[in-house]
Curated annotation (Swiss-Prot):
Keywords: Developmental protein, DNA-binding, Homeobox, Nucleus, Transcription, Transcription regulation
Function: Sequence-specific transcription factor which is part of a developmental regulatory system that provides cells with specific positional identities on the anterior-posterior axis.
GO molecular function: DNA-binding transcription factor activity, RNA polymerase II-specific; sequence-specific double-stranded DNA binding
Portion annotated as DNA-binding: 207-266
Pfam families the UniProt entry points to: Homeodomain
One GO term describing the cellular component: nucleus
Coiled coil, from the record: none
SUPFAM superfamilies: Homeodomain-like
The name this protein goes by in its record: Homeobox protein Hox-C12a
Amino acid sequence: MGEHNLLNPGFVGPLVNIHTGDTFYFPNFRPSGGQLPGLPSLSYPRRDNVCSLPWNPSEPCNGYSQSYFSSPVSINPSFNRSCEITRADDGKCYYNNGSGSRENCSGGGSLKREDRARDTSALTSDHGMHAGIGSTVAFSKYDYGTEQLTQDPPSCQSMESDSSSSLLNEASKPSSSDTQTLVSPGSHTGTITASGAAPWYPMHTRTRKKRKPYSKLQLAELEGEFMMNEFITRQRRRELSDRLNLSDQQVKIWFQNRRMKKKRLMLREQALAYF
């Protein structure tokens, strides 16, 4: 019978379910993810000298690999303050993980990067599948034909050339119509140009009433009335218009023009007498 000593592997081994004779673990000093008594015996490789520092760290470096995880997981995944050694950033390479934080791409980070790339590829494929389904639904609702969608838009140079050629053609058409209207200015009233378009200026479409000159009899009657009275009354104006076959407006305008003519003649006579 062996003595019941704590250092005896035959006594310590069955307690922690480890049957190796050269190694012994104390139950109170098991690392994280260590062997539980109810589980079968699993071999956990020892990782010595995880942190090679010249001083004793205040917190232990938990870097033991767990066999029931896909990748090595440490207890302090955020920042190992006691294990991180300050060194120059020149030899490091970083990559963004999407949340804005930087991670080191050396060492165990390669596995995380591969897993992250795999996850992102799966997400993009799912997103592309949903987007493709949505796009097919949208296109089936608004189906404009494949030819219209596949045709490339014309370049700016071709558009400019087409616009310039159309402008030149339009400029050449009105020139012929202008020559025609210049040749016969009196016949274009109420007509359309030869090119089929409307006239260029709106005054071409206006019909002006032809001036009808007064006859000698009418002028004599109006001059005699003006000599008697420059300012004709309404009653006398109506009588003149009925007798001379003129409108009331024509008699009124003639008397106004005749008064202005008399005024100009008087100013001219005064100017000649002064010089």
